[in-house]
Structure formats: C-alpha cells, structure tokens
Amino acid sequence: MSAKNAELKKTNLKKNYKAVCMEPKLTQIYDFKGFKQEGLLIRKGMTRELKNELREVREQLTEKMEEIKQIKDIMDKDFDKLYEFVEIMKEMQQDMDEKMDVLINNQKNNKLPFQNQAKEQQKFWQLGKMDKSSQAMITEEPDGVPLACDKNVVPPKPTRNPLESLHPCQSCCEKCLLCALKTNRNQGRPSHHAWVPFSPLSSGAAF
C-alpha cells in the first residue's frame, strides 16, 4: 500500500509540477493600501499621545519654574535680611570694641596711682633697709662683732659743774668762797689761792 501511494504521488507531482509552481500563493498577497491607512492611524494616535505628554511636561516645568522663582524671591529676601543682620552685628561689634577700649584705659588709669604708691612704698622700704644695713655696718667692729652702743646710741649729756648746783647766785661779792673756787676752776688755777685772804692762819704763825 505504501509503495502504491508513493508511485501515485510521484505521478501527480510530475503532472502538476507546472501548475503547482505557476499558481499564486494567496497567503503572500498583502493589501498595501489598508496597511498604509492603518499605519497612518497608528502614527496619528502616537503623535497625539506624545503631544499630550509634552504638554503635561511643559505645564509641570512651568509650575516648577514658578516654584523656583518663588523660592528665589524668598531666598533673596532672606539674603537681604541676613545682610542687614550682618551689618547690624558688625556695628554692635565695633561699639563693643570701643567700649572695651574705654574700660581698659580707665582700668589702666586707675591702676597707675596704686602702682606708683606701691613703687614709692617699695623705694622707701628699700631705703629704710639700706639705712638699717648701713647703721649695722657702722656699729660693727672690723672683726664683725657689734659694738656695745649699737642698740641705743645716746648722745653724751653735758657735764655740769657741781658748784653751780650748790651756789647758783649770779651777783655776789668777790670774797665768796664758792664763786672764787668756781672761777679758779674754770680758769684752771689752783684753788688754794682763794683761801689765802680768808685763812685765819694768814696773820698768825705757820705750823
């Protein structure tokens, strides 16, 4: 059966070879007009969608630009305020610097008299110390042993004549014994001459 079928197919192919090759294939025929129309419709729809999308994007961009402008205006205002604030801070800093300079000068001027007084006191103290050291050097012997009078140096009192206290008279006679002794002592004479005129033995015999 299979061999008979194969032979029939061969004969049919030989007979119908020309007919089969020359017949047009319906599947390969296309309607170009319809395809063009469909393509145009598709393109028109796509362009409309693209245009709509572009419009939306433009609207969004314009909105964003307006927002950016508003933000820029706000930033400019804030920047102006910041600039004014910075200028105010600079002026305040200058005022504070001037006030600090004035306070520092006042403090220096107030400290000067105290410093001068302290310096003067220090000078006086040094001078007193030098005086004490010089006195200590004077009152010390060459060997370094202090003298006996280094503590309280008392000036010598003037010696008084004991006869003045006994006989303080100023106007008296020349024959006064005390006055004679006084004058003889002051002049450096011996005191026995004053006793000669008044001696009871002057007119009598000597022993």
Curated annotation (Swiss-Prot):
Record keywords, A-Z: Coiled coil, Nucleus
Tissue specificity field: Testis-specific. Expressed during spermatogenesis.
GO CC entries: nucleus
InterPro entries recorded: Tex35
Subcellular location: Nucleus
Entry keyword Nucleus: yes
Chain segments annotated as coiled-coil in the UniProt record: 43-79
Keyword GTP-binding: no
PANTHER family: TESTIS-EXPRESSED PROTEIN 35 (PTHR36860:SF1)
Protein name, entry field: Testis-expressed protein 35
Gene designation per UniProt: Tex35
